[in-house]
Amino acid sequence: MTQRRSLTITSLGIAQTLAWASSYYLPAMLATSMARDLGISAPTVFLGFSLALVVSALLGPLAGQLIDRYGGRPVLAANSFIFAAGLAGLALAQGPLGMMIAWAVLGVAMAAGLYEAAFAALVHLYGKDARGAITGITLFAGFASTVGWPLSAWLELE
C-alpha cells in the first residue's frame, strides 16, 4: 500500500468516525438533554433525527452524482462545512423549529458525508481496487459509537 493511499484511508476513516459520531449516534446520548433545553419531548428530538434520515435518503443519489462529476475530495471537503453548520444549528436552536431545520441541514450532510458518499469517492478514486480501502474505512468508523458516546457524555457535562 502506498503512503498516499494509507493517508487517504486514515483521513477518510477519521472523518467517517467523526461524521457518524456527530450525526447518527448523537441523539442516543443527547436527546434527553436537548429535549429539556428546548422544552420539547425526547420523541420530538428523534423526529428531527428521522427528518435528517429522510433528507439523507432523498439526497443520496444527488450526492453520488456530484461525486461522479467532481470527484470525492471536493464533495466530502465541502460537506464538512455542511456538517458544521448543522451541528452549530443544533447548538443554537431555541425551539423545535430551529432544531428541525438543523436536523434537515444535518440530513444534507449525512447524504454527502457518510459511508455511501465515502465509498463512492473511493470507487471513483481506486476503481476495482477500492475494496481494501472501503474495508479500512469501515474498520475506522466502526469506532464511532465507542468514541462518540463517551465524548458526547463528557461534552454534555461541560
Task: Walk through the language-model features, giving the residues of each.
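Small-residue-rich segments within alpha-helical transmembrane domains of MFS-like 12-TM solute carriers
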Residues: 20-24, 107-116, 146
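Intracellular juxtamembrane helix-capping segments at the cytosolic ends
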Residues: 34, 112-126
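Short hydrophobic/small-residue motifs within alpha-helical transmembrane segments
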Residues: 50-57, 142-144
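Extracytoplasmic
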Residues: 7-42, 59-63, 148-152
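Hydrophobic core of transmembrane alpha-helices in multi-pass small-molecule transporters
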Residues: 17, 86, 97-113, 138
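Juxtamembrane helix-start elements in MFS-like secondary transporters
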Residues: 40-49, 134
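Conserved MFS/SLC helix-loop-helix module at the cytosolic interface between two early adjacent transmembrane helices
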Residues: 58-97
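Glycine-rich segments within core transmembrane alpha-helices of 12-TM secondary carriers
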Residues: 129-149
